[in-house]
Amino acid sequence: MGFLSAEEKGLVNGLWSKVNVDEVGGEALGRLLVVYPWTQRFFQSFGDLSSADAIMSNAKVKAHGKKVLNSFSDGLKNIDDLKGAFAKLSELHCDKLHVDPENFRLLGNVLVCVLAHHFGHEFNPQVQAAFQKVVAGVAKALAHRYH
């Protein structure tokens, strides 16, 4: 049995099918960089990150956020094997980029906030609980190489 029930998978997939990856990805990554400014050190090549407005309107932040959420979408297609789905990204972030694995958990929590903002009442407590499990599972899978 996987970490999500069939009902939870249905809730996650149902909401995710409505997500605008371009918009939500850029907003989630932008919020991560604003709320947790120490994460900006991994994105110094992105140009102006001097203020919340600069970050949220930064084209490179938006593009990378889209890339992150496209990877997240691919992972959802392999929800019962997140470790396998994210193995290469775990290796990249650990061995080459040296990203603190705690940042994966932070980004997951920011993503949940952004989804709640975008979907309002549709993002009810059951949907949130399912997504919290998913983002925790993705963070764990991305951190796997670190252990």
Swiss-Prot record:
Pfam families, per the entry: Globin
Top-level taxon: Eukaryota
Record GO cellular component, one term: hemoglobin complex
Keywords on record: Heme, Iron, Metal-binding, Methylation, Oxygen transport, Phosphoprotein, Transport
List of residues that carry N6-succinyllysine: K18, K60
Gene Ontology molecular-function annotations: haptoglobin binding; heme binding; hemoglobin alpha binding; metal ion binding; organic acid binding; oxygen binding; oxygen carrier activity; peroxidase activity
Positions carrying Phosphoserine: S45, S51
Domain (Globin): residue spans on this chain: 3-147
Transmembrane segments: none
Residues with Asymmetric dimethylarginine modification: R105
Tissue specificity note: Red blood cells.
Disulfide bridge map: none
Record function comment: Involved in oxygen transport from the lung to the various peripheral tissues.
Other remarks in the entry: In the cat family (felidae), the oxygen affinity of hemoglobin depends little or not at all on the association with diphosphoglycerate (DPG).
Subunit note: Heterotetramer of two alpha chains and two beta chains.
Name of the protein in its database record: Hemoglobin subunit beta-2
